[in-house]
C-alpha cells in the first residue's frame, strides 16, 4: 500500500503544480466574481449611497438646526440681557424719583411744621399778651382801690373824690413802672 501511495504521488506531482490553479477553475471564479461585482455595483452600492446621503443630510440638518437653535438662544440671551439692563435702569430711575419725592415730602412737612409752630407760638404770645393786659387792668383797679384806701388811712382823710383818687393812683402806678423799668435795666 505504501507503494501505491508513493506511485500515485509521483504521477500527480509531474502533472500539476498545487500552487498554480487550474485555468477552468480560475475562469469560473472570475465569472462569479464579475457577477458578484455587477450585483454589488448595480444594487448594493446605490442603496449604500442612498443611506449615506440620507444620513449625511440628517447630520447636516441636525447641525444646521443646532446652529439655528444656538443662534436663537444667543439672540434670546442678548434680548434678556437688554431687558435686564432696561429693568435695572428703570428701577434706578424709580428709586431716584421716590428718593426725590420723599425729600420733597419731608421738606413740605418740615415747612408745614415750622409754619404751624410759628402760628402756635404767635397764638401763645398773643394769648400771653392778652392775659398780661387783663392782669395789668385788673391789678390797676385793685392797686388803685388799695392805694386809695391806704392813702386815706395815711393822710387821715377819706379820698372819696374819684378824680383825686384817680390822680393819686396814676401817679403811684407811674412811679411803680419807673421803678420796675429801672430794676429791669
UniProtKB/Swiss-Prot annotation:
Chief location category: membrane
Membrane keyword on record: yes
Matching Pfam families: ATP-synt_B
Listed Gene3D superfamilies: F1F0 ATP synthase subunit B, membrane domain (1.20.5.620)
Membrane topology note: Single-pass membrane protein
Keyword Repeat tagged: no
Transmembrane segments: 28-48
InterPro entries: ATP_synth_B-like_membr_sf, ATP_synth_b/b'su_bac/chlpt, ATP_synth_F0_bsu_bac, ATP_synthase_B_chain
GO molecular function term, any single one: proton-transporting ATPase activity, rotational mechanism
UniProtKB keywords: ATP synthesis, Cell membrane, CF(0), Hydrogen ion transport, Ion transport, Membrane, Transmembrane, Transmembrane helix, Transport
Signal peptide boundaries: none
GO cellular component: plasma membrane; proton-transporting ATP synthase complex
Listed CDD domains: ATP-synt_Fo_b
Cellular compartment(s): Cell membrane
Family: Belongs to the ATPase B chain family.
PANTHER family attached to this UniProt entry: ATP SYNTHASE SUBUNIT B, ATP SYNTHASE SUBUNIT B', CHLOROPLASTIC
Function field: F(1)F(0) ATP synthase produces ATP from ADP in the presence of a proton or sodium gradient. F-type ATPases consist of two structural domains, F(1) containing the extramembraneous catalytic core and F(0) containing the membrane proton channel, linked together by a central stalk and a peripheral stalk. During catalysis, ATP synthesis in the catalytic domain of F(1) is coupled via a rotary mechanism of the central stalk subunits to proton translocation. Component of the F(0) channel, it forms part of the peripheral stalk, linking F(1) to F(0).
Subunit structure comment from the entry: F-type ATPases have 2 components, F(1) - the catalytic core - and F(0) - the membrane proton channel. F(1) has five subunits: alpha(3), beta(3), gamma(1), delta(1), epsilon(1). F(0) has three main subunits: a(1), b(2) and c(10-14). The alpha and beta chains form an alternating ring which encloses part of the gamma chain. F(1) is attached to F(0) by a central stalk formed by the gamma and epsilon chains, while a peripheral stalk is formed by the delta and b chains.
NCBIfam families named in the record: ATP_synt_b, PRK05759.1-3
Protein name, entry field: ATP synthase subunit b
Organism for this UniProt entry: Paenarthrobacter aurescens (strain TC1)
Amino acid at each position: 500500500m505504501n507503494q501505491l501511495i508513493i506511485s500515485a504521488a509521483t504521477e500527480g506531482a509531474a502533472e500539476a503544480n498545487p500552487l498554480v490553479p487550474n485555468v477552468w477553475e480560475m475562469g469560473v471564479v472570475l465569472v462569479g466574481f464579475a457577477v458578484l461585482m455587477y450585483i454589488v455595483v448595480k444594487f448594493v452600492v446605490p442603496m449604500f449611497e442612498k443611506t449615506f446621503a440620507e444620513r449625511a443630510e440628517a447630520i447636516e440638518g441636525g447641525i444646521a438646526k443646532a446652529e439655528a437653535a444656538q443662534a436663537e438662544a444667543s439672540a434670546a440671551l442678548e434680548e434678556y440681557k437688554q431687558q435686564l439692563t432696561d429693568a435695572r435702569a428703570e428701577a434706578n430711575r424709580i428709586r431716584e424719583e421716590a428718593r426725590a419725592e420723599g425729600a420733597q415730602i419731608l421738606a413740605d412737612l418740615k415747612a408745614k411744621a415750622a409754619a404751624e409752630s410759628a402760628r402756635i407760638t404767635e397764638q401763645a404770645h398773643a394769648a400771653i399778651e392778652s392775659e398780661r393786659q387783663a392782669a395789668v387792668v385788673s391789678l390797676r383797679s385793685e392797686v388803685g382801690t388799695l392805694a386809695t384806701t391806704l392813702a386815706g388811712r395815711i393822710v387821715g382823710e377819706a379820698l372819696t373824690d374819684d378824680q383825686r383818687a384817680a390822680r393819686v393812683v396814676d401817679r403811684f402806678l407811674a412811679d411803680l413802672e419807673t421803678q420796675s423799668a429801672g430794676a429791669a435795666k
